[in-house]
Design a protein with these regions (language model features):
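Short glycine/threonine-rich loop-to-helix capping motif typified by GTGT followed
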Residues: 58-63, 101, 232-240
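Aromatic-rich peripheral "rim/lid" segments of glycoside hydrolase catalytic domains that contact
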Residues: 227-264
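Active-site-proximal loop/turn and secondary-structure-junction residues that shape catalytic pockets
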Residues: 8-13, 52-56, 91-95, 122-126, ...
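Active-site capping/gating regions of soluble enzymes
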Residues: 64-69, 79-210, 216
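Well-ordered, non-membrane alpha-helical segments in soluble/globular domains
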Residues: 21-34, 101-104, 200-208, 241-251
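Conserved active-site loop/cleft motifs that coordinate metal ions or position small ligands
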Residues: 184, 218-225
């Protein structure tokens, strides 16, 4: 069996009309057809996973469900979509959207959407005080895009394209101060909370809980921390190799605790 993840259609701001979405769906159907032929030729079970990401065309599981519903309407009765297209569930991305892993994964499963792959990943989570905002400057870089989703005290959600945009916002001008920021910065899975920074590793652990309760829904789990070279100096005290070893150990320990090592 083989899986490949890909972008969730496009970046939301790039979409200006329905024609673009129709073309995207047509292209994805072309991918499904190609994967079907490739599967037949190789004798392997192959599938493509669309990976929802903050501020992209598909960024939540609800949006993913609506998209798959439309894909199925385009070609009623064509079951190849169930075999060769699914969702690549990135724990970091869906945690940033404040989704509950049991509800999010349950939503996909109940709509018979394949879980093509799961990215075991964790996002940066903070209460954005002035001290925290100052410390967050160390996470800004010119390599990756770090979207920020802010939850305000009343529950309202506000999005920033990138971390520098969020840091530039003047909190004194905001009528509703933010309660929490979740930042698209993949941090090591074994990272321990500090006085300033926390992580969304609880979403990852909830995902493992779901996999334990629903064995067999996904056999492709992938550690997805890739930001080693752009982390603040305070998180680069040890070599990348040593940190990768620790991340592997942590992941295997958590999978063992959830009884998943023999099922994954």
């Amino acid at each position: 069996e083989g899986s490949v993840s890909t972008v969730p259609g496009s970046y939301k701001e790039f979409i200006t009309n329905d024609r673009q979405i129709r073309e995207a769906r047509k292209n994805i159907w072309k991918c499904i057809e190609h994967i079907e032929h490739l599967s037949a030729r190789t004798g392997k079970k192959l599938h493509l996973g669309l990976e929802p990401e903050p501020m992209c065309y598909l960024e939540t599981t609800s949006e993913a469900v609506k998209f798959f519903d439309q894909m199925r309407k385009d070609r009623k009765g064509d079951l190849r979509i169930d075999e060769h297209l699914g969702i690549n569930y990135d724990c970091c991305h869906l945690a940033i959207e404040y989704e509950n892993p049991h509800e999010a994964l349950g939503r996909l499963v109940s709509h018979k959407i394949k879980i093509s792959k799961i990215h075991l990943s964790s996002a940066l989570k903070v209460h954005p005080t002035m001290k925290v905002r100052e410390a967050l400057k160390g996470f800004s870089d010119e390599v990756y895009f770090h979207q920020v989703i802010e939850r305000r005290v009343g529950g309202e959600i506000f999005r920033y394209r990138d971390l520098p945009d969020a840091l530039a916002a003047n909190p004194s001008n905001q009528p509703h101060l933010p309660e929490e920021w979740r930042i698209h910065f993949h941090i090591p899975l074994h990272h321990l909370p500090t006085g300033l920074f926390d992580s969304t590793v609880d979403h990852l652990l909830g995902t493992l809980d779901f996999l334990k309760s629903k064995p067999g829904i996904c056999s492709h789990l992938e550690m997805e921390t890739y930001t080693w070279e752009v982390m603040p100096e305070s998180m680069k005290q040890r070599s990348v190799v040593d940190q990768l070893v620790d991340e592997y150990r942590w992941t295997l320990e958590q999978m063992s605790r959830h009884g998943l090592l023999d099922k994954a």
